[in-house]
């Protein structure tokens, strides 16, 4: 939610929509990746909880980028675009726990799981930074 408010306030101040979308998304994804990458090296469960909380908060900021970009791309078809993208995203939600369970069984450690998650966030943040657009694609 905070990402949406932040993005809207920056756009109202005159910043270009594309710049704002990319900025909040990059902050959210790369900031979240930084937090996740530190988790395997923590000895205290409190520091792990704090880092996971920061990761979630930063994910909320990223929603002001990728989460509302659907409306930029196809204002008339936002619901359909969100539904399609959400359906594709659910594939990861189904597969991730299975893969994490297999990795835990094989290694007995969360280290690789957090590294994979960090890589996905870094890749997603950089991909969005270079390829995101706000021009209407669906009319």
Predicted regions and their residues:
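Paired intracellular helix-loop junctions of major facilitator superfamily
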Residues: 11-13, 69-79
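Cytoplasmic loop-to-transmembrane helix junctions
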Residues: 20, 77-84
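Interfacial helix-cap and linker-helix signal at transmembrane-aqueous boundaries
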Residues: 6-7, 11, 100-108
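Hydrophobic/small/kink-forming positions within alpha-helical transmembrane segments
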Residues: 1, 37, 94-95
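A membrane-interface helix-boundary motif in multi-pass transporters
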Residues: 20-23, 102-120
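C-terminal transmembrane helical hairpin of 12-TM major facilitator-type secondary transporters
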Residues: 18-65
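Transmembrane alpha-helical cores of Major Facilitator Superfamily
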Residues: 53, 57, 83-91
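Multi-pass alpha-helical transporter architecture, strongest
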Residues: 33, 39-40, 117-139
């Amino acid at each position: 939610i905070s990402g949406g408010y932040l993005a809207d306030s920056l756009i109202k101040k005159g910043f270009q929509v594309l710049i704002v979308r990319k900025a909040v998304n990059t902050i959210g994804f790369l900031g979240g990746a930084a937090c996740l990458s530190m988790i395997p090296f923590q000895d205290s469960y409190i520091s792990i909880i704090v880092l996971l909380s920061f990761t979630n908060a930063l994910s909320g900021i990223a929603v002001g980028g990728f989460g509302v970009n659907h409306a930029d791309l196809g204002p008339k078809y936002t619901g359909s675009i969100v539904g399609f993208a959400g359906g594709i995203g659910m594939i990861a939600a189904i597969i991730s726990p299975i893969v994490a369970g297999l990795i835990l069984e094989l290694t007995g450690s969360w280290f690789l799981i957090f590294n994979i998650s960090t890589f996905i966030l870094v890749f997603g943040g950089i991909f969005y930074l270079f390829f995101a657009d706000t021009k209407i694609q669906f009319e």
